[in-house]
């Protein structure tokens, strides 16, 4: 018979009591009061933070936006079809963050940084908060380096610098996205990381952009953040902040980055939808009172960093869609006042065959002039004024029966300048080509070329310089200055091409 020794039993019990881990995991839990339209009202969650991530019973994630006396208003970042009244909600103690790193390049992700391109998981090196503070005054430097878009009209008259915020604004179908995509394509040899944020667009449009970038070899230095029209409003609202966070990672590593928000009108509409469903008081055009702050805190994250901060930069090209050219609506005026200039695209110019359809008279770059390269600044100084005057004269000449010789000459020059600035989509030009084209127009060297042949002249001149005068192209690309020697080479090349074209026309 086994003898039971009480002292051994008591010793074992004492040991087990001592080894017992008394730590208790405390989680902040609430229950769903009401759910629908992408919004949930949650009872409990007394310790919830503003902007905290919530986890619902069916796995759907949400963000706590309204912290009220007796409930929390949350927006759902998913369909939430499995959420039932009375089901539990857990506060995660985390604020929304996104994976960042070199592994993101070439990938298509959603607003939460999850891949949606079917290429598997992303092995990101670290994460960044979606919402983060913009660089302070001391951490910044004034914009002084050019960000070449490859579009002659912009680089010559509305130059954009690294670290600038330049708005692209216009009606639907006027070529806003085309300008943004051309700018990405032009960064191939500029050592720049690009982030394209598609907000509330058709999934087919986003797929088309991805395909264009892949075909032209631009996907390798680009990250695409997509929140298409079928996504919940919360994801459309978050998408621009996600794009900014990814670009910020590279900016603080000393890299030059470019972010395109296409477009912020749809983000504002998504934010309005969320706010109204959360019963926040509406303001002008039913937008909430803080919609200005929604855009200003996003665009202030674009900066040119000081030398001490690593010299990185983040250039922002926000896009806004207007209704019937009305730039005095609420969102357009807000974003115009936040940005450092705007490129205004006109549907009338677009329909008349001018592509890109930039209205030079009301487009402006407030800080880009300091960043413009000397070569193009030297020759393009009068270009914007001449085109603006041409627009006025063209309108006036429709009613005038006879015009003096000087006015006719100005109209003739203006027509040729406008033709010179036409540029097909997906064909950005290098600096040397832009210098040659603008020089030919501004100096009046193509006045003998028929207006309908100016586009052909532009192409012939570029081909002639590439094949016969590569030293001119190399000098402009390297030194960024139009020297007297280079100018004489260019003059000779232009006269050669013009004489050939005039002779063949006769």
Curated annotation (Swiss-Prot):
CDD domains on file: ATP-synt_F1_alpha_C (cd18113), ATP-synt_F1_alpha_N (cd18116), F1-ATPase_alpha_CD (cd01132)
Complex and partners: F-type ATPases have 2 components, CF(1) - the catalytic core - and CF(0) - the membrane proton channel. CF(1) has five subunits: alpha(3), beta(3), gamma(1), delta(1), epsilon(1). CF(0) has four main subunits: a(1), b(1), b'(1) and c(9-12).
Similarity comment: family membership: Belongs to the ATPase alpha/beta chains family.
Keyword Cytoplasm applies: no
Location in the cell: Cellular thylakoid membrane
Protein role: Produces ATP from ADP in the presence of a proton gradient across the membrane. The alpha chain is a regulatory subunit.
Gene encoding the protein: atpA
Binding site for ATP: 170-177
SUPFAM superfamilies hit by this protein: C-terminal domain of alpha and beta subunits of F1 ATP synthase, N-terminal domain of alpha and beta subunits of F1 ATP synthase, P-loop containing nucleoside triphosphate hydrolases
Gene3D superfamilies: 2.40.30.20, ATP synthase alpha/beta chain, C-terminal domain, P-loop containing nucleotide triphosphate hydrolases
Reactions catalysed: ATP + H2O + 4 H(+)(in) = ADP + phosphate + 5 H(+)(out)
GO molecular-function terms, A-Z: ADP binding; ATP binding; proton-transporting ATP synthase activity, rotational mechanism
InterPro entries linked: ATP_synth_asu-like_sf, ATP_synth_asu_C, ATP_synth_asu_C_sf, ATP_synth_F1_a_nt-bd_dom, ATP_synth_F1_asu, ATPase_a/bsu_AS, ATPase_F1/V1/A1_a/bsu_N, ATPase_F1/V1/A1_a/bsu_N_sf
Site residues (Required for activity), renumbered to this chain: 363
E.C. number: 7.1.2.2
Keyword terms: ATP synthesis, ATP-binding, CF(1), Hydrogen ion transport, Ion transport, Membrane, Nucleotide-binding, Thylakoid, Translocase, Transport
Gene Ontology CC terms: plasma membrane-derived thylakoid membrane; proton-transporting ATP synthase complex
Name of protein: ATP synthase subunit alpha
Protein's membrane topology: Peripheral membrane protein
């Amino acid at each position: 018979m086994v003898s039971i020794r009480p002292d051994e039993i008591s010793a074992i019990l004492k040991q087990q009591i001592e080894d017992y881990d008394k730590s208790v995991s405390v989680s902040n839990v609430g229950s769903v009061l009401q759910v629908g339209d992408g919004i949930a009202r949650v009872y409990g969650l007394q310790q919830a933070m503003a902007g905290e991530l919530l986890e619902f019973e069916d796995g759907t994630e949400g963000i706590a936006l309204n912290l009220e006396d007796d409930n929390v208003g949350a927006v759902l970042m998913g369909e939430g079809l499995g959420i039932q009244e009375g089901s539990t909600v857990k506060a995660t103690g985390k604020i929304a963050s996104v994976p960042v790193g070199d592994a993101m390049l070439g990938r298509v992700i959603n607003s939460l940084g999850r891949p949606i391109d079917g290429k598997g998981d992303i092995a990101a090196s670290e994460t960044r908060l979606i919402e983060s503070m913009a660089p302070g005054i001391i951490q910044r430097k004034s914009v002084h380096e050019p960000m070449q878009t490859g579009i002659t009209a912009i680089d010559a008259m509305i130059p954009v610098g690294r670290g600038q915020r330049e708005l692209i604004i216009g009606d639907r179908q006027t070529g806003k996205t085309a300008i943004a995509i051309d700018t990405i394509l032009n960064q191939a040899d500029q050592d720049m990381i690009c982030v394209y944020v598609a907000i509330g667009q058709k999934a087919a449009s986003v797929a088309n952009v991805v395909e264009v970038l892949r075909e032209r070899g631009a996907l390798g230095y680009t990250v695409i953040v997509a929140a298409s029209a079928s996504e919940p409003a919360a994801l459309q609202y978050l998408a621009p902040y996600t794009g900014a966070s990814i670009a910020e990672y590279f900016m603080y590593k000393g890299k030059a980055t470019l972010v395109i928000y296409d477009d912020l009108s749809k983000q504002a509409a998504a934010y309005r939808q969320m706010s109204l469903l959360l019963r926040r008081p509406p303001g002008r055009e039913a937008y909430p009172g803080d919609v200005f702050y929604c855009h200003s805190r996003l665009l202030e994250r674009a900066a040119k960093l000081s030398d001490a901060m690593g010299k990185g930069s983040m250039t922002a090209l926000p896009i806004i869609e207007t209704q019937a050219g009305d730039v005095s609506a609420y969102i357009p005026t807000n974003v115009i006042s936040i940005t450092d200039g705007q490129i205004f695209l006109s549907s009338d110019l677009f329909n008349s065959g001018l592509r890109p359809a930039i209205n030079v008279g009301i487009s402006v770059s407030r800080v880009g002039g300091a960043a413009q390269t000397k070569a193009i600044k030297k020759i393009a100084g009068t270009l914007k004024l001449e085109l603006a005057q041409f627009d006025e004269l063209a309108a006036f000449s429709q009613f005038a029966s006879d015009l003096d010789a000087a006015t006719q000459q100005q109209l003739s020059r203006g027509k040729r300048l406008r033709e010179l600035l036409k540029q097909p989509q997906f064909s950005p030009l290098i600096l040397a080509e832009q210098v040659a084209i603008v020089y030919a127009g501004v100096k009046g060297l193509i006045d003998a070329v028929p207006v309908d042949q100016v586009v052909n002249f532009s192409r012939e001149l570029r081909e002639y310089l590439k094949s016969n005068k590569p030293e001119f192209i190399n000098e402009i690309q390297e030194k960024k200055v139009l020297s007297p020697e280079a100018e004489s080479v260019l003059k000779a090349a232009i006269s050669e091409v013009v004489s050939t074209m005039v002779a063949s026309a006769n």
